[in-house]
């Protein structure tokens, strides 16, 4: 997991080949007027924009998830977003089977750590990171 601000996003371009186009896409957007929905940017790179108000820690854990293939970059545009995290290796209570079509495994475990994102901060969740939301 990586937590940082958009100002430092360029430091992570070398971590994964899709990080640079993802962050360049974000930088080119008017974040205060961004549309809600799913958008394919390029092969293997999809943006899901959710403009909902940030969730509390309690509401976030209702969807405690991880992915086998995808990496999530989640951005707080404005406000305060509470998130939960736990290493996948410590999760022992799967909530159903892995959904290959959606690339998601849900867990009933509780996060080890809660943290907040505020204006223009992002988090990158890798497959070994179980996160909420």
Model-derived features with residue positions:
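Short, conserved beta-strand element in jelly-roll/cupin
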Residues: 68-81, 87-89, 97-108
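A short glycine-rich, His/Asp/Glu-containing loop-to-beta-strand
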Residues: 36-57, 64-65, 69-77, 85
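A short local loop/turn or secondary-structure capping micro-motif enriched for an aromatic residue
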Residues: 56-57, 91-94, 133
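Conserved metal-binding segment of the jelly-roll/cupin
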Residues: 115-133
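Compositionally biased, non-globular sequence tracts
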Residues: 12-28, 93, 97-106, 119
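A short, N-terminal "cap"/entry segment at the start of jelly-roll beta-barrel domains
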Residues: 1-48, 63
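Beta-hairpin (beta-strand-turn-beta-strand) motif
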Residues: 52, 76-80, 86-90, 120, ...
């Amino acid at each position: 997991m990586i937590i940082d601000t958009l100002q430092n996003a360029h430091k992570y371009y070398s971590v994964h080949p899709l990080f640079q186009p993802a962050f360049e896409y974000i930088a080119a957007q008017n974040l205060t007027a961004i549309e809600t929905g799913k958008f394919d940017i390029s092969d293997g790179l999809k943006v899901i924009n959710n403009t909902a108000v940030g969730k509390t820690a309690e509401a976030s854990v209702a969807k405690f998830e991880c992915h086998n293939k995808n990496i999530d970059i989640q951005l707080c545009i404005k406000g305060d977003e509470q998130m939960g995290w736990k290493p996948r290796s410590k999760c022992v209570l799967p909530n159903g089977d892995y959904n290959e079509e959606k690339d998601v495994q849900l867990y009933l475990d509780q996060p080890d750590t809660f943290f907040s994102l505020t204006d223009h901060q992002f988090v990158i969740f890798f497959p070994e990171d179980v996160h909420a939301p």
